[in-house]
Amino acid sequence: MSDGTATPDPLPSSSNTSTSLRPTSRVRDESDVIGKLNDMIEEQPTDIFLYVKLLKHHVSLKQWKQVYETFDKLHDRFPLMANIWCMRLSLEFDKMEELDAAVIEPVLARCLSKELGNNDLSLWLSYITYVRKKNDIITGGEEARNIVIQAFQVVVDKCAIFEPKSIQFWNEYLHFLEHWKPVNKFEEQQRVQYIRKLYKTLLCQPMDCLESMWQRYTQWEQDVNQLTARRHIGELSAQYMNARSLYQDWLNITKGLKRNLPITLNQATESNLPKPNEYDVQQLLIWLEWIRWESDNKLELSDDLHKARMTYVYMQAAQHVCFAPEIWFNMANYQGEKNTDSTVITKYLKLGQQCIPNSAVLAFSLSEQYELNTKIPEIETTILSCIDRIHLDLAALMEDDPTNESAINQLKSKLTYVYCVYMNTMKRIQGLAASRKIFGKCRRLKKLVTPDIYLENAYIEYHISKDTKTACKVLELGLKYFATDGEYINKYLDFLIYVNEESQVKSLFESSIDKISDSHLLKMIFQKVIFFESKVGSLNSVRTLEKRFFEKFPEVNKLEEFTNKYKVLDVNYLQRLELDYMVRDVMPEAIALDRGSNNLKRTMREEEDGQAFKKFKANEDPIPPEIVELLKVLPKRQYFKVTIFEAHAFSEFLSDKVTIQ
């Protein structure tokens, strides 16, 4: 069997997206399981399940060196995924009869160090497991017991007081203390102090099983000393009641939250591991609600303790919805607000980009941080890494699912968008030459990018020099690939109208109208040119254009098109002021259709007090927003030839016949 090595092909770069460069396109023997899995990981380095499959294969063959190497790759990519560290530690615990400190302690040091700051309870429980195995109370006596108690207390301070679902830890700690058999009165006193301190800590925190713990505590105090029990219980009662109430609040806001990541290799399956580029939006919203709830500091903690609690929740969210950019963005900004060290934001954004390399949100946020610190090479590296990842995703999709036009077009749009931002960023930092260089690369991508790249570059050229010549040449280049794209032609016309290139507007219009197959976009092109001609040309030329328009679209409402021609500041005042029934978002109260005629007529009905309904005016009695939203989706009144609903008669019926008790 192959050892899984192969000559690595270069990944698709910003200048080449040939699908043949995909790592999974390498030719391998059918039996080369390891090689194939390594290729798949190289192509999709954020797919945790691929690493798990590879790990299980290495474990089955007892290839421990390869197991460690694979775990190291996982940890480098997902350093804050505590459940992956737990998988590694549980594997070590299971395969060793005697614990090897030289193997386990470096792993614990890496994952629990201040640099990473993993504060997940399941990971710290692995730490407790190791400490207890290493320090046997029977053989180690008082020294071993003190070490274990210190370890438990570290876990209390690091994460147990922040975790609402931590009953397993508290039970384990209590069980350890309760089974301590003191050999003298001093040790008995010590034991009582430790247990009381533990109860006073846990019963003040909003967490599960508080009621049962409270009963257990009150009974324990009675057993220790009936004379002092009431005093100790009374001192804790108010805090316990508050914690119980807060826990109920927490349960309500986190209803439906899923926290079931596997912590051993055998538990890990494709269904219970996060999938790259996927996350449950509903789960994300619950996490955001939990974070918002914690930000209110309902426990009235000190600033440092509140920050530690917020950090705990953020890092929990970063594990369970690790492919949601919003979590990383929010966590980075929160840490930036709470720390004087500006590099903290950069650190968390980099961790986020490792997890979601195709995220434009994280790439742009990180590049902003580098720009503020004038780190130009890092800016380019950050944005290009995002571009390369999108290139590879696009190449894979075009090869694996070439008929999925919607997904392909979405990736093309995203790729183009990131290039547009990249052009603007480098123009801002290094000037027009840098922007042109990027545009030159984009041109070589041909139809892998959308026409927006040409439009954006044209605007950049124009805004820098106010010279339309270069900008128009850029847009002409776009016609080579997008001459039949109605959306591109529309935006091209927008630019020409913006810079008042009258002759080019006419030229583009005449050369494009027979190439556009989308009738809606073609209609927009006609309307745009007619409106422009009405502003800068002659009435005869407008009439000529209108004639051609009506011949091509005989179904259009000529009055409506007439009013569109007389817009001012893009507002159709003719419809708003005189033909208001044509406007969907404003409807007068007293417009009705006469039953005996198809002609529209306004009727003014008299109220009982003789007051006529007034015509609606923008500055009088504004329509409530809810009504406006309803009116927006209703069809125009002119589509109804008879009165469907007699509002006045209905109001009279309600007034005269209905009595509200």
Curated annotation (Swiss-Prot):
Compartments, as annotated in UniProt: Nucleus; Cytoplasm
Q: Where is the composition biased (Low complexity)?
A: 12-24
Q: Keyword annotations for this protein?
A: Cytoplasm, mRNA processing, Nucleus, Repeat
Where exactly are the transmembrane stretches of this chain?
none
- Chain segments carrying region Disordered: 1-29
Disulfide bond among the record's keywords?
A: no
Where do the HAT repeat units fall? 62-94, 99-133, 143-179, 190-223, 264-296, 305-337
Give an example GO cellular component term for this record: protein-containing complex
Output the PANTHER family linked to this UniProt entry: CLEAVAGE STIMULATION FACTOR SUBUNIT 3, RNA CLEAVAGE STIMULATION FACTOR
**Name the record gives this protein:** mRNA 3'-end-processing protein RNA14
User: From which source organism is this entry?
Assistant: Kluyveromyces lactis (strain ATCC 8585 / CBS 2359 / DSM 70799 / NBRC 1267 / NRRL Y-1140 / WM37)
